[in-house]
């Protein structure tokens, strides 16, 4: 078991904190695009804001997969959101990756986003999926497999607990006051402070 696999087997709230500082990697157009995870949100099976709360559907079926599987969905008729499945198979929990700090493949991210400012590339769920060219084709990928087109990569430079801000989730209408959003303190790439 690698370190990321161990993180994703933690309770989803703990995993959402521990994913901060690790890397999301996309292999696109013969390039490697890398972003450091700087903001996450946890979604639990008993959480009214979670896609698996009511029942299992074709759209949310990947939320019930093995921890470390990607769950990508289309929202508002125009945006993709990228999640990492956590918990045991059949539970239906995931972590939304809300923001990344661009690390590598920045020129391609700028082309993908039609933006040049670093701060505009991955500072929100829809922005980061566009920057890394993540869409429904990436739903159900094993993010712990080094040969996957999208994967998680461990960062030995871990984030201290005192550098993690815990606050309410944003951009949702149900259970929005739950303190399930986490971000790296003073990081300029988070979507909203």
UniProtKB/Swiss-Prot annotation:
Disulfide bonds: none annotated. The keyword Metal-binding does not apply. Its EC number is 3.2.2.-. Pfam families: Pur_DNA_glyco (PF02245). One of its GO terms (molecular function) is alkylbase DNA N-glycosylase activity. GO terms for biological process: base-excision repair. It is an enzyme of class 3 (hydrolase). Keywords: DNA damage, DNA repair, Hydrolase. The keyword ATP-binding does not apply. Signal peptide: none annotated. CDD domains: AAG. InterPro entries: Formyl_transferase-like_C_sf, MPG, MPG_sf. HAMAP family: 3MGH (MF_00527). NCBIfam families: 3mg (TIGR00567), PRK00802.1-3 (NF002003). Belongs to the DNA glycosylase MPG family. This is Putative 3-methyladenine DNA glycosylase. It comes from Francisella tularensis subsp. holarctica (strain LVS).
């Amino acid at each position: 078991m690698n370190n990321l696999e161990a993180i994703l087997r933690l309770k989803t709230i703990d995993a959402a904190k521990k994913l901060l500082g690790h890397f999301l990697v996309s292999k696109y157009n013969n390039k490697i695009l890398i972003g450091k995870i700087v903001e996450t949100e946890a979604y639990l099976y008993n959480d009214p804001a979670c896609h698996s709360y009511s029942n299992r559907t074709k759209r949310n079926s990947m939320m019930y997969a093995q921890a470390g599987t990607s769950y990508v969905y289309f929202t508002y008729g125009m945006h993709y959101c990228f999640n990492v499945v956590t918990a045991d198979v059949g539970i239906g929990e995931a972590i939304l990756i809300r923001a990344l700090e661009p690390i590598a493949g920045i020129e391609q991210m700028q082309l993908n986003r039609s933006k040049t400012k670093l701060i505009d590339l991955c500072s929100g769920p829809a922005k980061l999926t566009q920057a890394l060219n993540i869409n429904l084709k990436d739903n159900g990928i094993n993010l712990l497999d080094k040969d996957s087109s999208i994967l998680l990569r461990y960062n030995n430079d871990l984030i201290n607990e005192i550098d993690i801000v815990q606050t309410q989730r944003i951009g949702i209408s149900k259970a929005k006051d739950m303190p399930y959003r986490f971000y790296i303190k003073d990081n300029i790439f988070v979507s909203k402070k």
